[in-house]
Structures are given as structure tokens and as C-alpha cells.
Amino acid sequence: MYIGIRTRQEVEVQALTMASHVASLRGWHTALARAEIASLLPMAVVKRLPARRLIQLEGEISPEHMLEAVNCSSGCQALLSHAVLWSTEQPIDSLLKQMSDYIQTHTRTGSVAVRSWKHEGKMEGVSARDLMRKIGGMLSSHGYKIDLEQPEHRLGMVLDAKAGIVACGWMIGTGDDSDGISARRATDRPFFKPVSLDPRLARLAVNLASGPLQKGVTLDLMTGTGGFILEAAVSGREAYGIDLDSEMIEGAQKNLDWAAPVTTASLLLGDATRLLDVLPSDIIHRISGFVLDPPYGRNSQGTLEPTALIRAVLESCYSVAATDAHFVLIVPIHPFGEHAEEALPEDATVELLHGQWSELEACFEQTGWRLLERWVEHVHASLGRLILHAVIVPRD
């Protein structure tokens, strides 16, 4: 049994009114992106909008927290502060009136520009260029200096053609579909193995497990080539990576030096099933995020079969975890098809490549962890990945 996160990710369609904030998501796996931003901004209530790549964030969120979240996020391309939401069912003049009021209410100091981008193709009957020109004119009439090259502030506008929604607000983030993470793809690293994770998924898993940057330590349990710890280090997290194979530790260190030459991240030679014997004493019970992508083709734990290995790791993690720790596990599965818009329902049946789902589920329940959500990533015609998110359950 696992528990879906319903308190922060409500699935009902929200009325299109003045939102607290709107997050614009990249399109590669929107279900995971929603969960990631909820983890990075735990003070926010995340609500669904009719557009698959737009979500509403309610609550008191500081600009500093929003900037930190979008800068380290894998799945969020921008946040629009105190955004205006408009539907094509309304007259276009109502959007312009709302934006006029918005510009007067939400002031900025310094030069500005208007930036627009599209989701799901071209929006019929709405010209992004015309809207940008009119909103830019409003800014100019209120005394703002327009600087298209290096503005100090950007007013973002995203047009979602499929949902018929326009969201506008002062931007935090770039609005780009490209996140820059692909520059660290596995094949470009000094040390490479074919089984290495896509850095987008590695970054997202780290954020999902660890939460806000200052929450605690991130632990990459079987680091291999260092995919998780690289993304944690580049984000500025306090992070440790462990592996029993000295070749992997040496190779991961080369990758770490290449990706993040100035970092506090550290690699340790040791056994993830015996963490109390491996970790520095000052991080015990400060570890808030555990990430694990077990090396099935290279069983570094001797004769343990996959499910027994995961159980032993979960037990070891429980003994060193913070009281609010989270755990993200990625395991290979038989093809499940595309399923990028929603978390898996509780009754969905998945076939693991190694072991049985019922046994893996029991591993979490019996070692002090509660499964929250699970997602599937399509890899190719003969392989998928199951991403599991769990939270620690304090023992009596």
C-alpha cells in the first residue's frame, strides 16, 4: 500500500482568477515535475490547472525561496510571481485590463522586458507579438526603461494553446525548454558507463528526495559514475556518494572534478548496507534525502539478490536518517508505455526486471518507510523505469 500526496497536489481544475504564483513546467515528464516543485517549495500548496504544464502555487513563498527552487529544478522552466491567468473564453480586453492593474500593483525597480513562450503549439486568435507590444507599452507608460538585451526584470507570458490559457507575471527563471543539464550528459563525462542515468532524471530525483537546498544532507547510496552526486553538487547541496567499487569512486571523482570543481560534495568507499560504519559521525541523523539506482548488472553487495539488497539498504538508511527524511528509488521495469502526465494509480500493475513488486513494496513497509507515489519513465521499447518516492515513518 502506498499513500498518494493529495494535500499539496489537488487534482481538481481551479477557477481562473488571480493566482498566488504559477509554475511553468518543462514537457518531458510533467507528473514528476509537479512532485519536484512541491518538494522544493514545501510551504506551497500545489494545485492543478487545466493546462498540463502549468500549476498554481498558493501560500507565503519568499522570492528567495522561489529563485532557489527554479534555479535547481529539473522540471520547472519559470515561476510567474502573483500571476494573472486568462482564458480564451474571455475577451482579450479583460487580459489587458488585468495586466494594467497588475503592473500598477506589482512594481519593480530597474529596466524591464517582456518575454513570451508557447506550450502545445500556436494559440488560435491570439497574437503573442501583439500582446507583448501592448504590455510593453503599458510598462513604458508607467516609466519603466525597456531593455531587450539585459533587463533587470522580465515580465513573462506563457500561452498554452491546448488549454486556451495565458499566464502572465514577473518572471523567476528563464522560460527555456532547455535546462542546461544536458551539458552534463553521461557520454560527455570523463568517466562513463552505458547504464548511466539521464542527468535530468538524476537532478529531479535528488530534488524530490532532498527538498529545499538547506534542508539537510543528500546521500547517493551506490554512486557508480556519480550521476546523482554530480547534480547535487552542481546545485550547491551538501552531498555524499558511496560505492564499494574503488574504480567507481575514482571515476566518479573525475566526473565530480569536471562538473563541479569547487564543491563540498564527498565520495566514500564503503557499503550502503552498513552506513554507520562508513559515514562521518557529524552527518548521522542529518541526512534528509536518499537516492538509489541499484547497479543490477554489477552487484556490488556480493551475493545479495536485488530485493534483499534493497531491504538491507533501506534498513541501513533508517538508522542514519533525519526525522523527516525522504527516499527515492529507481528500478528497471518491463515496458509500461508513456505515462508522463500522472503518477501511477495504486492498482496499476508493474513488472520489475528483477523481483516482484509485492516483495519490493513490502521492503519499504517493513523497514520504516512509507511509499508516497510512484511514476514510470519510458526508456525504449524493451525498458522502462519505476521511480518510487517514500518518507520515513518514526518508530515508537
Write out the residue ranges for each language-model feature.
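A broadly used, surface-exposed interaction patch
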Residues: 65-103
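N-terminal cationic-hydrophobic initiation segments that often serve targeting/anchoring roles
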Residues: 103-104, 318
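Phosphate-coordination loops involved in phosphoryl transfer and adenosine-cofactor binding
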Residues: 108-111, 215
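Basic, glycine-rich polyanion-binding accessory segments appended to enzymes
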Residues: 114-117
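Short acidic low-complexity segments
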Residues: 145-151
